[in-house]
Amino acid sequence: MPRTESLDQYLAQSFDRVRRGRRDGLNRFKVDFRASSLPVCPRLYHIYRRLPWAKRPFVQESFTGDAAAMSGTALHLALQRWFGLECQAFGRWKCFKCDVLVGPTAGVQACPKCQAPMIYQELEVEKSKLVPFTGHIDMVLVQPKTNRVYLLDFKTISPRKIFEVRQSGPYRKHYYQINAYANAINLGQQDVGVDHVDKVVLIYVDRGDPWITWAPVQMPVSRKVYRETLALIATAKRSIKEMIPPRGICSSTEDPDAHWCPVKNICFSPLLETMLSDEVQPRDVGDRDRTYDRILQEVNNH
């Protein structure tokens, strides 16, 4: 075999551009009431609803972001399959070839038509009277002897962040997300095959060495944190009626929660009001906005 050569300059520059690649995506940023976006920042939502569409920043795309997202999707599929094989994961299972859905039931199922192993279908959290958001649950485990129900959420991250979790505990936003799922089930608002969740578990998995480096974190379900989650949504919606920017969840642009914020450069500007429209963009459907304070009150009384 011949000796290796130094890369041609053209190739070296091309590879470097790919590794560092970053550009505006096709879509402008928006704020959705999804569990994966919790906790909702009231100030970000207010800016989103009053910033003219043409001035809203585009969602940034990057090679590293694409690589992380795609590897995360693949790891989720592998984790769900092997939790089904080894731990009788509870949920719905689908054969895409035959378009057959089975469950909710425990363990990887064979397709009744072609006998091929079926793929785990994440249980959906739907909006309801006390649940003003949507989302998908990564995994449910039911302990056979005690019927204890665990809600699992997989987070694929870098080795450095695994170290941070082991030192300082889970990321706040991740707990808000999985806790919201658990409360949605415990409030009796979801048809997912289980009627309660006893514990939530965040499983941080190293994208580079998923078979070696895990950092599982078990936590209780908190009604108090859920009420805070709903209060943030209610504050965001109410601010649009009052047309006054509310406080956000960050204290400065240096706050860790602000790192990926699409509007952090204008959020703390003393000239913020001059950048916003005097009209809601796009307009709300009025009746829908009035529900959030009532939802919070009903959860408090539940």
How would you describe each model-predicted region?
Residues 2-11, 118-119, 167-172, 285-301:
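A signal for specific C-terminal beta-sheet/loop modules enriched in small/flexible residues
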Residues 105, 184-302:
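Metal-dependent nuclease catalytic regions and adjoining charged, substrate-binding loops involved
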Residues 1-150:
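Metal-dependent nuclease catalytic cores that hydrolyze phosphodiester bonds in DNA/RNA
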Residues 30-35, 168, 193, 291:
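Short, solvent-exposed coil/turn linker segments
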Residues 61, 65, 69, 167-172, ...:
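Short, charged/polar micro-motifs that form catalytic or ligand-binding hotspots
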Residues 72-76, 176-179, 255, 259:
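Non-catalytic, well-ordered alpha-helical scaffold segments
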Residues 107-113, 120-238:
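Mg2+/Mn2+-dependent nuclease catalytic core
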